């Protein structure tokens, strides 16, 4: 299955893969029930395990490239939310879009408007549509206004 450039866990897993998994499970149950199933062992050499995505994984490192950070943010959306820090507190990032490069220090806020919060990165920028700094996700613009974060402001690495 092709993975698009804006996929998140929600769009890829819940909207695309989960329905296919349900179909495959129904087919497998029908094969077992009818005696047509042909079991085979999993090749352990090709098996892999992905543990839970926690804050150790979700912390954004501003030394990484814009492409790597964009992928991390999308991979942590909707949970737990990749994060940067503002005044030492995590700001989790959602609904992100990779933008062209800007000549600014990574973590610098370029602008914040109804379209989202734009943060400079190495080799690009990230437009963030929603954030979670306290309990609930909210539009990035509402958070930025409340936090006094605007153009010229700075977010720090999450790690």
Q: Which role does the model predict for each range below?
A:
Residues 62-159:
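An anion-binding loop in the catalytic cleft
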């Amino acid at each position: 299955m092709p993975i698009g450039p804006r996929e998140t866990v929600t769009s890829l897993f819940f909207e695309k893969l989960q329905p296919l998994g349900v179909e495959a499970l129904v087919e497998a149950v029908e094969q077992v029930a009818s005696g047509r199933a042909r079991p085979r062992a999993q090749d352990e050499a090709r098996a892999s395990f992905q543990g839970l995505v926690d804050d150790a994984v979700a912390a954004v490192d501003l030394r990484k490239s814009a492409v790597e950070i964009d992928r991390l943010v999308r991979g942590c959306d909707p949970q737990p939310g990749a994060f940067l820090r503002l005044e030492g507190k995590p700001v989790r990032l959602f609904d992100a879009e990779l933008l062209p490069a800007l000549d600014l220090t990574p973590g610098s806020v370029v602008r914040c408007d109804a379209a989202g919060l734009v943060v400079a990165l190495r080799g690009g920028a990230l437009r963030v549509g929603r954030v979670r700094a306290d309990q609930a996700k909210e539009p990035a613009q509402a958070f930025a206004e409340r936090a006094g974060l605007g153009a010229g402001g700075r977010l720090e690495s999450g790690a």
